């Protein structure tokens, strides 16, 4: 798979991955359920409102996904970002984080998604908010449940469970304008270092509503 920094056009991303894990005899005895997870860019050419009154798209990058029991193996709020997360958040390059986390799977643009899981499993992902220095989308709290307490699959639009995070590795510039952001930077490490920690984004800039940038849908996978 070829991984590149985000473009500046609307992108529809869907991931096709098969994740099977054996995490103990009880879990292994539970039947597996196959899901289709779609991570879709719904940006338009004017999603971002720029200081000069014009607009710009807010594309998503390639990303990385994981199914497991924990909140997220990719990041923890209040902790410094790993090198891999830094690469993902600053340049949309998932290679590093995929190498750091056993079982993590990279995904690119326009790829179909199939996730196989058992009750108790959770799904997480990270994709760069392309018009930023080091922001990324991921589930709130790190991951989202795939089953309810009764073991039934949770299907439908899950976008409301997603948040925009700041990796804390590079000082934020005005989204869609900053010279050290995805579409305009020459290298992924050219921005001013921040030496911070991962938090839900909280700065002086305005960002588009979640539903104008990304849509995450979980559905039953078609029978093979």
Task: Label every model-predicted segment.
Residues 30-34, 42-147:
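Structured domain cores in non-transmembrane regions
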Residues 13-22:
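Bacterial N-terminal signal peptides
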Residues 2-13:
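Bacterial N-terminal signal peptides that target proteins for export
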Residues 23-28:
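Sec/Tat signal peptide C-region and signal peptidase I cleavage site
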Residues 53-65, 74-78, 84-90, 146-224:
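Extracellular low-complexity, O-glycosylation-prone Ser/Thr/Pro/Gly-rich "stalks"
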């Amino acid at each position: 798979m070829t991984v590149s920094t985000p473009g500046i056009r609307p992108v529809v991303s869907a991931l096709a991955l098969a994740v099977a894990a054996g995490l103990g005899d009880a879990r292994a005895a539970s039947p597996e359920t196959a899901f289709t997870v779609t991570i879709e860019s719904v940006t338009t050419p004017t999603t971002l409102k720029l200081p000069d009154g014009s607009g710009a798209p807010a594309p998503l990058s390639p990303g990385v996904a994981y199914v497991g029991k924990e909140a997220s193996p990719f990041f923890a709020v209040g902790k410094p970002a790993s090198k891999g997360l830094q690469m993902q958040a600053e340049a949309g390059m998932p290679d590093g984080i995929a190498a750091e986390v056993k079982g993590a799977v990279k995904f690119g643009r326009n790829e179909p998604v199939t996730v196989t899981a058992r009750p108790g499993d959770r799904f997480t992902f990270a994709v760069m908010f392309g018009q930023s220095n080091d922001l990324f989308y991921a589930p709130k709290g790190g991951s989202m449940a795939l089953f309810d307490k009764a073991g039934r699959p949770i299907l439908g639009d899950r976008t409301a469970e997603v948040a925009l995070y700041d990796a804390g590795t590079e000082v934020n510039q005005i989204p869609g304008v900053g010279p050290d952001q995805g579409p305009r930077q020459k290298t992924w490490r050219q921005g001013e270092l921040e030496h911070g920690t991962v938090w839900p984004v909280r700065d002086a800039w305005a960002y588009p509503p979640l539903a104008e940038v990304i849509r995450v849908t979980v559905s039953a996978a078609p029978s093979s």
